């Protein structure tokens, strides 16, 4: 995407800053230079808009994602449904911090909607971002983790 933009606009250099949406919002609110802010959730975009950090009329939904539960390749228990996460075979679940990480808010919301949050809340290991959840899963430090399909 950056290379295509640079090609279409000679002399322009695109720099990316990838981080959790809340972290990026804090950087922007403290004056970090930015031309495009792509948040992983509507809540963070709402906060940016409430803080007048978005140019009027520029907010657009340009992509969507799906929430996935992933398990380590060597997992003994392989949950197939959200309900399986409440079972005895799943002891630790990586979940982005619902207070600050969009994937965590979405995961908690899905578990609440399924009536499972009380059963799994004590099993959750909160992470700072999706990448950390995925790393915990890849290393087999948790039995499952919530990530985005992408």
Describe every region a protein language model picked out.
Residues 1-18, 22, 26-30, 39-42, ...:
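Exported/periplasmic ABC-transporter solute-binding proteins
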């Amino acid at each position: 995407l950056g290379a295509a933009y640079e090609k279409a606009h000679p002399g322009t250099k695109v720099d990316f800053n990838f981080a959790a949406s809340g972290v990026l919002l804090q950087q922007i609110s403290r004056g970090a230079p930015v031309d495009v802010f792509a948040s992983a959730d509507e809540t963070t975009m709402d906060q940016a808009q409430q803080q007048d950090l978005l140019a009027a009329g520029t907010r657009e939904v340009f992509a969507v994602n799906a929430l996935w539960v992933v398990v380590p390749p060597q997992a003994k228990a392989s949950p197939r449904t959200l309900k399986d996460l409440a079972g005895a075979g799943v002891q630790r679940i990586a979940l982005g911090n619902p207070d600050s990480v969009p994937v965590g808010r979405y995961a908690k919301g899905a578990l609440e909607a399924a009536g499972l949050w009380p059963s799994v809340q004590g099993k959750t290991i909160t992470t700072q971002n999706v990448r950390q959840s995925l790393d915990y899963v890849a290393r087999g430090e948790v039995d499952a983790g919530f990530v985005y399909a992408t």
